[in-house]
Each structure stands twice: as structure tokens, then as C-alpha cells.
Amino acid sequence: MTLAITSRLRRNFVFRRRNLESLLSPQCQKLINDLRSCRDTVEVSRIHGYMVKTGLDKDDFAVSKLLAFSSVLDIRYASSIFEHVSNTNLFMFNTMIRGYSISDEPERAFSVFNQLRAKGLTLDRFSFITTLKSCSRELCVSIGEGLHGIALRSGFMVFTDLRNALIHFYCVCGKISDARKVFDEMPQSVDAVTFSTLMNGYLQVSKKALALDLFRIMRKSEVVVNVSTLLSFLSAISDLGDLSGAESAHVLCIKIGLDLDLHLITALIGMYGKTGGISSARRIFDCAIRKDVVTWNCMIDQYAKTGLLEECVWLLRQMKYEKMKPNSSTFVGLLSSCAYSEAAFVGRTVADLLEEERIALDAILGTALVDMYAKVGLLEKAVEIFNRMKDKDVKSWTAMISGYGAHGLAREAVTLFNKMEEENCKVRPNEITFLVVLNACSHGGLVMEGIRCFKRMVEAYSFTPKVEHYGCVVDLLGRAGQLEEAYELIRNLPITSDSTAWRALLAACRVYGNADLGESVMMRLAEMGETHPADAILLAGTHAVAGNPEKSLDNELNKGRKEAGYSAIEIE
């Protein structure tokens, strides 16, 4: 009933709009047609100049149309027009809010909304929907909650599309309970978009079971299941890894009659791949009447994740036979799997196919190639690919530095890291970059370089070291017989020392049998109130390695006891 009314209203709206446009002057009609064909700001500005020359810039309808088209192409140009309009109306304000909501400056929509309220114009639901879109993009919880309150007091919450926008806003901002509250307050005015939005919100916070419960509620309601809702449903099944659930979901798609939709076919292939039904995924793929590159990529990716790399290569050749042009995404997952399994032959075959297809070497694909070649032992090829890359991101640099380190070329790894800092101001090293450099220094015995890198990580980039970073530094100094230097380094860090660093050092003391330093570290942990029974056992082991069995026993008995673990079996 609701759908029929909505459809009738939409037809009436289109009919009235066409009637309205037919009543416009030929000059105005030509203006609208010209604006529809505009592709850039230059063309819009020419029409704007024509309007000023002919006096159409005083016509509210013509100016509204100019704003509507220019706000999509260039919001700043639209803003310059809007600022000079003396008689702004609600449509113009909504147009500007919408323009900002899809621009690079979504936060400016808030000031336009405030201007709209200050002018005293009557708001409509689109004023809220477009402003909420900006709130979602900027994660502005307080502003979004304020809009919710205004909409509630103004009586706009009866509109389903506004409620859907609110649910989306709360989901994006991680306030899933508030999103559910809005949903529960609208039992009679929900549609498929409402269910899909909230289901996606549950999936974002890893609450797959609640997403499935919501789908069951939808099935019991009068709301018709659509492709978007089914995609969310299949995603939840995939994340749960339930093969029997996947088969039931597949049957449901067939019953509803949407199993031939290309998006659903791709989702079904991915679902079966993730739930262990790779043969079922292949059957769906083979039976698909129509396939696009995304469908091919999905099947190849599922084979790659399952370790069936030869099947991936066969599919790549089949793509070429069927004249389906692959893209960079076709190769990325497969190359990563080759790197993980150290499958050099398959990796080179894939790389050769990539060369044949002349796929552009972007940052993601280039990084996958560098990583694959480095991990299968072909470092020279990795360097060649890295040097060919025009666009390199932090992952590209990190992959190449890691490759040097894995091949024992610590000096080259440090040199490349320094080059990254010097030549690429836009590329900022991350915690993983520092970890691979520290690891290379540790295995290469570059003590000074490693310490300098660690200090830069903390002092220049303000990263908080993790246990892996501390482990590399302690191992680096330990291999050089400089555990005391490691002690001083941790003690003098410009950040508040935590137990992670001291425990890494305590473990190193046990390896190298430095009992005195181990006692000092234990005292530090005690001063911090971070002692644990396992620390006493580590110290006991340190004394044992140092040849002090008495102290080893004393430490274990008196300084701490570790509770015994146990297993339990419940018997009915």
C-alpha cells in the first residue's frame, strides 16, 4: 500500500515538474538544458555571465537551477554565487548544504544550516538529511545529535528517509545502540533501506548475530527483501564462517528470485570461499550467464586465499581467452598469496601475465610485486619493480626495506629508509616501517643505526613503541653485549616507560645470563607496581643460566608463584 502511494506521488511530482518547465519562457528552458550539459566550471561560468547580461540572475528559479548544477561541479564557485543572492530561499540553502556534504569541505554545511535557521525559513526534511550526511563524513556526534533533537521537536521524524539518514549517522559514528533506538521507534515506517543500513552498522562493529536477527525480523515483516539487504545478509554469513548457513542463504536467494543478480553472484562466491565451500563457489562462477571483472577477481581471490594458486593462473589465462580485461585488483591478492607461500614459479607466471596485459603499475600493485619478489628470493626483480614505480606510498617503501632486511642487506635497508625521509616529505613512515628497519639493524648488527632509528621513532614521530620494537632494540643491543645500554635507553625514553619494555629486557637477561641486570629490571617493575609471577620465573631462569641455582630456586619460591594452569571437562 505504502509503495503504491509513494509510486503515485512520484509520478505526480514528475508530471508537475514537466508542466512547470513547460510554463517557463523559452529563454529559461534553454538555460536549464545548457546547464544540464555542463561538464566543468568554465562552462557554468559562461552561462552565469549570460544570465547576468540578460537579467536572468534576478530570476529566483534560474538562480536556483544555476546553484543546483554548479554546487555539484564546483562548490566554491556556487558559494560565490550564493553569497550575492539577495533573496535566498529554502531550495537554495538546501542546494548549498547538499553541495558541501559531497565536497572536500563537508563541515561548511553546518554554517549554512545555521544561516538557514537564523533567517527564519521553514525547514524541510532535506535540510536535515543533507546536513546529517556531513555529520556522518566528519563524525560530528554532537552536531548530529543536535539535529536529531531539532527534527524530533519539529515533527520531521515521521519521514522514513530522515530516520534512515539518522540510523546511518549513528552507525558510522559507532553509536549502534542509538541507531537501534531510532529503528525501534519506527516499526510502521521502515523500508529495505532501513534494514540494510542498520545491518551494515552491526557488521561494522562485528555484531554478525544481531545483523542476522534483524534480517529475520525483516523476513517476518511486509518489507520486500532487495539486493542491498541480501548483500548485508551474505556478508554476515561470510564473517561467521558457517557453511550450512551459507547454503541456506543461497537457497533463499534462489527462492526470492535474485540469484541471477551479478552483485549477488559475486557475493555468493565470496561467501562460499570464506566458509570453506570453494567447490560451490566455483559452480556458481561457472553457471553465471554474465560475469564482470569483479566476479572474476572474486573467484581468483578465493582460490588464492585457499592456496589453490594453479587454479588462479588457469583463471587468469581463461580471462585472456574470453577477452575479459583484468585490472590491478585481479593480481594483488594472488601476488600476496604467492609471497606468503613462497611460490616463486607461480609468482613469476603471474608477473608475466601482468606484463602481457600492460596493467599500470600503481602503488598497490607495485607493492604486491615488490613484496612477492623479495619473499621468493628474487631481490633484484623487487628492486627493479620498486625503481620503476612512479607513485610510492608508505607500504611500498616498507616492503622494499623489509626485502633488504630479509636478505641480510641491513646497510641497504637503512640507506633506503634515510632516502625515504629525505626525498618524500609526503610519505611518512609508520610503526611497521620502523619495525622492519629495527629488525634489519638487529640481524645486521648495526647498533648505532638501530638506536638512532628507535630514537627518531619516539622523538621525531611521537610513536609509542610496542613490544616488537622493544624486542628488536633489546635483541640488537644484546647481540652486541650491550644490555646495560638497553637498560639506560629504556630508562631515559621521553615517554613514560611501561612494563612491556622492561619485560623485553628481562627476557634478554635470561637469554644472555645477566643476573645482576635482571635483578635491577625486576626492581623497576616492582617500583612501577607491574610485577607478575611470570617475571619471577624469568628471573629464576636468568640465575640458572648465570650458574646460580640457589638463587634460582629462591626466586621461584619466594619472589613469586605462578598459578598452575588446569583444564576442565564438564560431564553430565
Swiss-Prot record:
Specify where it is mainly localized.
mitochondrion
InterPro entries tied to this protein: Pentatricopeptide_rpt (IPR002885), PPR_At4g14850-like_plant (IPR046960), TPR-like_helical_dom_sf (IPR011990)
Q: Does the keyword Transport apply?
A: no
Which one of the record's GO molecular function terms can you name?
RNA binding
PPR repeat locations: 89-123, 124-158, 159-189, 191-225, 226-260, 261-291, 292-326, 327-361, 362-392, 393-427, 430-460, 466-496
Region Type E motif, as annotated, extends over: 501-572
> Where located?
Mitochondrion
Spell out the coiled coil positions from the record.
none
Which superkingdom heads the taxonomic lineage of this protein's source?
A: Eukaryota
Q: Name one Pfam family in it.
A: PPR_2
Which GO BP terms apply?
Answer: RNA modification
Q: Which keywords are on file for this protein?
A: Mitochondrion, Repeat, Transit peptide
Question: Which PROSITE patterns is this protein grouped with?
Answer: PPR
Listed GO cellular component terms? mitochondrion
- Transit peptide span? 1-117
Q: Which family does it belong to?
A: Belongs to the PPR family. PCMP-E subfamily.
What protein am I looking at?
Answer: Pentatricopeptide repeat-containing protein At1g26900, mitochondrial
Q: Which organism is it from?
A: Arabidopsis thaliana (Mouse-ear cress)
